[in-house]
């Protein structure tokens, strides 16, 4: 904890929390202070102008980041017949039906994402209490319930991230790693921002993208000047 405290103090000494930094400067600060012995993730928080308590203003979806996430993703798929073969060919790590459901009920879940063909939801629906709390329950809104399981698998493997507003109307997502170039991080950030703009609820009023902040796994946040995010 002592090392963490020193690092946090050093970070706070360099960052003006009342200031919004140009994107390049924000990334430079974060990378400079990301001194952990592993390749820290670069995370984004976006404060949206929505009332997350209203169901019609919940922003939820997914987007494939052009530069990926830097993470190896393991995918499980519920499918049968031809679709099962397509999922395997696309790179799915596990494909099954009742056998996969029993594996999940037993607590054996060596995967990060679950994808399901619509006709398998009679089985998948019984797993809500297990998959739901882990954020892995398939949902058509994020593209994980789909007849095109092959494309869903490819997207997941290519660096697709899911997003959803929390109770405060904030989106949290990972846009890469410390080892990524600034250009790669920016392309990923812009892809996410574009997806959020397209998902803007019709009932949202006033400023929609209120605040954008970046941080590393072990670091504090740096606010980003949105005017510097032009492609």
From Swiss-Prot:
PROSITE patterns: RIBOSOMAL_L1
Molecular functions (GO terms): rRNA binding; structural constituent of ribosome; tRNA binding
GO CC annotations on file: cytosolic large ribosomal subunit
Keywords: Repressor, Ribonucleoprotein, Ribosomal protein, RNA-binding, rRNA-binding, Translation regulation, tRNA-binding
Ribosomal protein is among the record's keywords: yes
Keyword Glycoprotein annotated: no
GO BP terms in the entry: regulation of translation; translation
Pfam families named in the record: Ribosomal_L1
Family: Belongs to the universal ribosomal protein uL1 family.
PANTHER family named in the record: 54S RIBOSOMAL PROTEIN L1, MITOCHONDRIAL, LARGE RIBOSOMAL SUBUNIT PROTEIN UL1M
Function, as annotated: Binds directly to 23S rRNA. The L1 stalk is quite mobile in the ribosome, and is involved in E site tRNA release. Protein L1 is also a translational repressor protein, it controls the translation of the L11 operon by binding to its mRNA.
Quaternary organization: Part of the 50S ribosomal subunit.
Protein's UniProt name: Large ribosomal subunit protein uL1
Gene encoding the protein: rplA
């Amino acid at each position: 904890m002592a090392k963490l405290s020193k690092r946090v103090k050093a970070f706070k000494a360099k960052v003006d929390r009342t200031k919004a930094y140009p994107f390049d400067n924000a990334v430079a600060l974060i990378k400079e202070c990301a001194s952990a012995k592993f390749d820290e993730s670069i995370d984004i928080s976006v404060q949206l102008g929505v009332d997350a308590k209203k169901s019609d203003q919940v922003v939820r979806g997914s987007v494939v980041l052009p530069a990926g996430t830097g993470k190896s993703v393991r995918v499980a798929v519920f499918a049968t017949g031809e679709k099962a073969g397509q999922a395997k060919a696309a790179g799915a790590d596990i494909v099954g039906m009742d056998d996969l459901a029993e594996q999940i009920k037993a607590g054996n879940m060596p995967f990060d994402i679950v994808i399901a063909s619509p006709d398998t939801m009679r089985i998948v629906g019984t797993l809500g209490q297990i998959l739901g709390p882990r954020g892995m329950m398939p949902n058509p809104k994020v593209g994980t319930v789909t007849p095109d399981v092959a494309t869903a698998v490819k997207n997941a493997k290519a660096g697709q991230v899911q997003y959803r507003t929390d109770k405060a109307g904030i989106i949290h997502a990972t846009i890469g790693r410390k080892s990524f170039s600034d250009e790669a991080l920016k392309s990923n950030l812009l892809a996410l921002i574009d997806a959020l703009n397209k998902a803007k609820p019709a009932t949202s009023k006033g400023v929609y993208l209120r605040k954008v902040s970046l941080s590393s796994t072990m670091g504090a946040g740096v606010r980003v000047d949105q005017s510097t995010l032009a492609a």
